[in-house]
Amino acid sequence: MAKENSSHSLAEAKRKRLTWILCVSGLCILSYVLGSWQTNTVPTSSSEAYSRMGCDETSTTTRAQTTQTQTNPSSDDTSSSLSSSEPVELDFESHHKLELKITNQTVKYFEPCDMSLSEYTPCEDRERGRRFDRNMMKYRERHCPSKDELLYCLIPPPPNYKIPFKWPQSRDYAWYDNIPHKELSIEKAIQNWIQVEGERFRFPGGGTMFPRGADAYIDDIARLIPLTDGAIRTAIDTGCGVASFGAYLLKRDIVAMSFAPRDTHEAQVQFALERGVPAIIGIMGSRRLPYPARAFDLAHCSRCLIPWFQNDGLYLTEVDRVLRPGGYWILSGPPINWKKYWKGWERSQEDLKQEQDSIEDAARSLCWKKVTEKGDLSIWQKPINHVECNKLKRVHKTPPLCSKSDLPDFAWYKDLESCVTPLPEANSSDEFAGGALEDWPNRAFAVPPRIIGGTIPDINAEKFREDNEVWKERISYYKQIMPELSRGRFRNIMDMNAYLGGFAAAMMKYPSWVMNVVPVDAEKQTLGVIFERGFIGTYQDWCEGFSTYPRTYDLIHAGGLFSIYENRCDVTLILLEMDRILRPEGTVVFRDTVEMLTKIQSITNGMRWKSRILDHERGPFNPEKILLAVKSYWTGPSS
C-alpha cells in the first residue's frame, strides 16, 4: 500500500513540473512576438526618428550641414584634402539634446596680429637682439620671447599674397607681393643675385663669387672634386645669400642646408624658401650649429664674411665637427686669390696674405689636407679617421682634442669650444671612422652606421627596415586623403618629429624636400641617423619658435609630437607657431590619440583652419587617429 502511494506522488510531481515549464515557455514566446511586432514599426521620416530618440532634428541637421561645409571648402586643393569621397570622417562629438554649459570647450577665435608683424620671427627679433652682446655675433643668435612677450594672434600674410610658383619654376621666380622687398635687387644688382620683372622676382643664379652663374661655378668645383657619383649628398652653405648655390646643387642630387642670419631688410633666407630651396635662419656665432657631428659631406663658404681666422680658428673647428670623415670644405672669396682681387676688396696685400696664412694654419691644426687651390676656389679635405691625427696632437696640442665626456652630437644652445671633436675609433688608417656610407641614392635605405654600431638605444637593423615599410604604407594612404600630394602641390615640407627619417625617405619620388626636425625632448636622438641616410634636418625645442620666416612651408607633419609636449608648454603656442610657418592653403597632418586630436581641433577651429579626423591607415581599431587640417587663405589689410 505504501508503495502505491509513493508512485502516485512521484507522477503528480512530474506533471506539475511539466505544466510549469510549458507556462514559462509560452510566456517567453508571447514576449518575443510582442517585441518583434513593436520593433518592426520603423519610423517613416527623420522627424519621427529624432522624436523617438529624444533628439532635436534642427540642431542635428545644422551640424550635418556644418560638417559638409567644413569638408568642402572653396579652394580646389583644399577640397581635395578635406573631401569625404575616400576615408570616412570620424565624429567624436556627443549628439545629445541636453546642452552642457562647459565654458572651456568654447571655441576661441584668434585675431590677426598687426601688419607690422607680417615677417615676424619670434626668436630672431631685431629689437630683442639689441639687448645682447655684439661679441661673436651673439645679438644675432636665437633669443626667444619671454612669457610676457608671447603673441596669441595670427601672423598676417601681406595684402595680395599669392600661392608660390610650383617647382621647378619657383627656382627662378617668386611673387613680389609675397616678399615686397626690392632692396636686395638694388644692392646686389651688379652681382646678378635677383631682379625685379613686373610683379615677379627673377633669380638669374648669379652670386658674388660666381658672375657666370651658380651652375658654371658648380661645374668648376666638379672639375676638382667628384660631385656626381653619389659620394657627396649633404652640404652646408654658410652665409648662403638667396641660396642659388643650394638651388643648383639639387639638379646634381645634392641637398644643401643653406643658412644666413635674419637680415635688416634683405630677407635672404625668406627668398630661398620662397624659391623652394632648403634654408634656415642661422649664424656662426658663439654656439654650435644645430646639427649633429659628422652630418655633412661638404661645407661651402662663398664670401660668407665669417672670420675663419679669428679666435684660434674656432669657427673652422665647428665646421670640422659637422663635417663627415673625408668631407670637403670649399672656400671662395677673400682671401682666396687675393693677388688678383686685393684692390677691389679694398684691403692691403699684407692683410689678405696674413688672413690666408692663418686659415691654412687652422686647417692644418685640424689635420685637414689641402686638395687644391685653383682660380677663385680653395678646397680642403677632412681625414677619414684620426689615426694619424692622434699622433700629431701629441706634439701639436693646439687646439686639443675634446674630452671624451663631451657629447659631439649635442648642439642645442651649446657654446663653442676650442677643441677638435674626436672621430670614432678606427682600426686602420684606411678605415672610415664611424662607418662608411653607401653612395646616393642607395644611402637612403641602407642601414645607417649609427644603427649598425648600436649607438641608438633599442634601434636595430630590423626595426629600421620595419619603419621604412610602415612609411611606404602611410604615404600610400596619404595619397588617398591628400590627392594633391601626387600633383606636386607640396614643395617645402616639415616633419616636426622625424624619428628615423622614414617620412622623408618615402617622399623621395615627389618633387619636394623635407626639413627633418628632431625635438630636443625626444626619447631617442636620431638626427645623426637622418643625416647618414642623406637627408637634412635640425634640432628644435617646440616650446620655442622655429628659425624660419612666416609662410615658408606647404605641408607640415606632426606625428606624436603633442604627446611629447602637452605637459611641457602650452599646446596653443605650438599650434600658433605652426600657423606662422604654414603657407595659406597649406596642409597639416597630425597623428595622435583621439583625446589629443580633439583638443588640437578645438584650438585650430579658432585659427581659420578646416579639419577632419580620420581613421588610422590600418583601420578603425588602431587607437592612433589622423587629423587632416588645411589653413584657409586670407591676407592682411592694405595700408
Curated annotation (Swiss-Prot):
Glycosylation site list: 104, 427
Statement: the UniProt record of this protein carries the keyword Membrane: yes
Family that this chain belongs to: Belongs to the methyltransferase superfamily.
SUPFAM superfamilies, alphabetized: S-adenosyl-L-methionine-dependent methyltransferases (SSF53335)
Protein name: Probable methyltransferase PMT18
GO molecular function: methyltransferase activity
Positions on the Cytoplasmic side per record topology: 1-19
